[in-house]
Curated annotation (Swiss-Prot):
Biological-process GO terms, alphabetical: glucose metabolic process; reductive pentose-phosphate cycle; response to light stimulus
Organism of origin: Zea mays
Gene: GAPA
InterPro entries, A to Z: GlycerAld/Erythrose_P_DH, GlycerAld_3-P_DH_AS, GlycerAld_3-P_DH_cat, GlycerAld_3-P_DH_NAD(P)-bd, Glyceraldehyde-3-P_DH_1, NAD(P)-bd_dom_sf
Quaternary state and interactors: Tetramer of either four A chains (GAPDH 2) or two A and two B chains (GAPDH 1).
Miscellaneous remark of the record: Plants contain two types of GAPDH: cytosolic forms which participate in glycolysis and chloroplast forms which participate in photosynthesis. All the forms are encoded by distinct genes.
Alphabetized GO MF terms: glyceraldehyde-3-phosphate dehydrogenase (NAD+) (phosphorylating) activity; glyceraldehyde-3-phosphate dehydrogenase (NADP+) (phosphorylating) activity; NAD binding; NADP binding
Protein name in UniProt: Glyceraldehyde-3-phosphate dehydrogenase A, chloroplastic
Active site, UniProt feature: C220
Transit peptide: 1-66
Length: 403
């Protein structure tokens, strides 16, 4: 049985350069909406971060030496981002990543972890160890390769939690194969299908039920949308609305025109704006049930590799002004949504939000109110890095309330 370990630090989640330095990029402390962190702040901030999500982190326990044994299934964009984010938390993390399932093998896993076209070169010593492991700053992580989760050696390795990052095993039957293989719990890094409980850190993760063996971290877009929608609904009352996410292309699209079940995603991703579906708006009701049936939306996939932006338009029941809407966001960002929500007052563009640790950054200058009851909000998010930080946070919550 694994126990949890929490840091007593009081530094908010996203303050200054922080974890972007672990990604191989220059520090994002230069972004004007963030203060410059001291080195002490930085080490505190990366040591452990779920303390900064209001009540979502659950009760704290004293630090112990035992850690949750974690395996990553699928070492693609989210799997590798997750490992970098976890590595950035340092020794204070209650997680211990001990295994990766990747069909590409050891050489490919180590190379793609070290060298990343979006994140840059990983500031860690990464190398293969024989034919079945990689080393990250001396930490040896076993690499296995099997497309069928039922065959994975999770029982033999004593795996407590599987980070399911393939995007394939998202229902109880599929994710349950990890439990059949000996793992105790599964965290899906995608919207779950069926009745799988969905949690968004900062929104409803305080309701986490440790008796559930399979949970979902929702989608990157839901993680961006839900925090500020929660603020809007609490302060002004949402009647109905629509959302458009202008979303960077993903691995589910085609580099050149080729077959795909979605005829639009079949078209060349780097050459087109690709309208497609998203369940993010409807999925908000999974974490904010009072909004069921009130939101819907679409996605526009665009030729950028990372960072996306949500455009939400809602009708509200309480008359308001743009300044009041932004102030509500500022208040939440300074309190219960510290480290989850930020407000930016500078005219930035998508690349400026690369490796942003938060789930959602409101572009304050673009907030509009038409009449007195139609509100338009624009919010940026790093759909890979920011989302992966929340996966680590939710895994930390699992560790904190392990049973």
């Amino acid at each position: 049985m694994a126990s949890s370990m929490l840091s007593a630090t009081t530094v908010p989640l996203q303050q200054g350069g922080g974890l972007s330095e672990f990604s191989g990029l220059r520090s994002s402390a230069s972004l004007p909406m963030r203060r410059n962190a001291t080195s002490d702040d930085f080490m505190s901030a990366v040591s452990f971060r779920t303390h900064a999500v209001g009540t979502s982190g659950g009760p704290r326990r004293a630090p112990t030496e035992a850690k949750l044994k974690v395996a990553i299934n699928g070492f693609g964009r989210i799997g590798r981002n997750f490992l970098r984010c976890w590595h950035g938390r340092g020794d204070a993390s209650p997680l211990d990543v001990i295994a990766i399932n990747d069909t590409g093998g050891v050489k490919q896993a180590s190379h793609l972890l070290k060298y990343d076209s979006t994140l840059g070169i990983f500031d860690a010593d990464v190398k293969p160890v024989g034919d079945n492991a990689i080393s990250v700053d001396g930490k040896v992580i076993k690499v296995v390769s099997d497309r069928n989760p039922s065959n994975l050696p999770w029982g033999e390795l004593g795996i407590d939690l599987v980070i399911e990052g393939t995007g394939v095993f998202v229902d109880r039957e599929g994710a349950g194969k990890h439990i059949q293989a000996g793992a105790k719990k599964v965290l899906i890094t995608a919207p779950g299908k069926g009745d799988i409980p969905t949690y968004v850190v900062g929104v409803n993760a305080d309701q986490y039920n440790p008796d559930e063996p399979i949970i979902s971290n929702a989608s990157c877009t839901t993680n961006c949308l839900a925090p500020f929608v929660k603020v809007l609904d609490q302060k002004f009352g949402i009647i109905k609305g629509t959302m458009t996410t202008t979303h960077s292309y993903t691995g589910d699209q085609r580099l050149l025109d080729a077959s795909h079940r979605d005829l639009r995603r079949a078209r060349a991703a780097a050459l087109n704006i690709v309208p497609t579906s998203t369940g993010a708006a409807k999925a908000v009701s999974l974490v904010l049930p009072n909004l069921k049936g009130k939101l819907n939306g679409i996605a526009l996939r665009v030729p950028t590799p990372n960072v996306s932006v949500v455009d939400l338009v809602v009708q509200v029941s309480k008359k308001t002004l743009a300044e009041e809407v932004n102030q509500a966001f500022r208040d939440a960002a300074a309190n219960e949504l510290t480290g989850i929500l930020e407000v930016c007052d500078v005219p930035l563009v998508s690349v400026d939000f690369r490796c942003s640790d938060v789930s959602s950054t409101i572009d304050a200058s673009l907030t509009m109110v038409m009449g007195d009851d139609m509100v338009k909000v624009i919010s940026w998010y790093d759909n890979e890095w920011g989302y992966s930080q929340r996966v680590v946070d939710l895994a930390d919550i699992c560790a904190n309330q392990w049973k």
